[in-house]
Amino acid sequence: MSRKCELTGVGVLYGNNVSHSQRKTRRRFEPNLRSVKFTSDITAGKYRLSVNARCISSVEKAGGFDAYILQADDNVLSSNARAIKKKIIQTKTAKSL
């Protein structure tokens, strides 16, 4: 499983540990990923996604999972999240007809 947020696309960064004597050794900065179950109000379904901790508060701030994923750019979403977004859009248009 990749160390990447499925909603924001945040992944592993690389940098240096710097000691007191200024020696530099390579290291990885990994995102704080959590496996979270989001509930969609439109489709009435539950979806488990691997997201970073900052994204969880962003989803709440946007007004819920449906509002966040509908305004999210398709380029940063994972293939699983894009499929969920497509399902939400289809259900929303079917309910509005």
From Swiss-Prot:
Signal peptide: none annotated. Keywords: Ribonucleoprotein, Ribosomal protein. One of its GO terms (biological process) is translation. It comes from the Bacteria. GO terms for molecular function: structural constituent of ribosome. The keyword tRNA processing does not apply. One of its GO terms (cellular component) is ribosome. It holds the Pfam family Ribosomal_L28. InterPro entries: Ribosomal_bL28, Ribosomal_bL28/bL31-like_sf, Ribosomal_bL28_bact-type, Ribosomal_bL28_sf. Belongs to the bacterial ribosomal protein bL28 family. HAMAP family: Ribosomal_bL28 (MF_00373). This is Large ribosomal subunit protein bL28. The lineage of its organism: Bacteria, Pseudomonadati, Pseudomonadota, Alphaproteobacteria, Rickettsiales. The gene is rpmB.
